[in-house]
């Protein structure tokens, strides 16, 4: 499958998911982005259009694998959410399948105390 077609499919899935979920200041959207090398996460207040907290795999240091790095990103975003007074979030998988790095990030965030 060509890269452009895969990206178009992911963007369609993301638009479909985004129609249903919305972040508020009390329960922001935990948005995930995956590049080939790194994993990024943001807590977004969609009403104000502001990012409340962010973390990425460049900050967590060395990891054995990209999945392990994503789990550490989840734990880091959960700790930053606690610092900002956020306990709950809406998980936005960004059109990616809930598998591998995306699932590891979600599990790490849950292990860090974030609820969704």
From Swiss-Prot:
Pfam families from the UniProt entry: Ribosomal_L18p
Designated name of the protein: Large ribosomal subunit protein uL18
GO cellular component: cytosolic large ribosomal subunit
HAMAP family: Ribosomal_uL18_B (MF_01337_B)
One example of a Gene Ontology biological process annotation: translation
Species: Rubrobacter xylanophilus (strain DSM 9941 / JCM 11954 / NBRC 16129 / PRD-1)
InterPro entries: Ribosomal_uL18_bac-type, Ribosomal_uL18_bac/euk
Role of this protein: This is one of the proteins that bind and probably mediate the attachment of the 5S RNA into the large ribosomal subunit, where it forms part of the central protuberance.
NCBIfam families: L18_bact
Transmembrane segments: none
Similarity comment text for this entry: Belongs to the universal ribosomal protein uL18 family.
Cross-referenced PANTHER family: 39S RIBOSOMAL PROTEIN L18, MITOCHONDRIAL, LARGE RIBOSOMAL SUBUNIT PROTEIN UL18M
């Amino acid at each position: 499958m060509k890269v452009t077609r895969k990206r178009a499919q992911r963007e369609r899935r993301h638009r479909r998911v985004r129609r249903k979920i919305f972040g508020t200041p009390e329960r922001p959207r935990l948005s995930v982005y995956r590049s080939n090398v790194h994993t990024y996460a943001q807590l977004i207040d969609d009403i104000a259009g502001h990012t409340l907290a962010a973390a990425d795999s460049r900050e967590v240091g060395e990891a054995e694998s990209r999945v392990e790095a994503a789990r550490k990103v989840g734990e880091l975003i959960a700790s930053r959410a606690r610092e900002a007074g956020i306990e709950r979030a809406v998980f936005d998988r960004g059109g990616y399948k809930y598998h591998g790095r995306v699932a590891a990030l979600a599990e790490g965030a849950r292990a860090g105390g974030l609820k969704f």
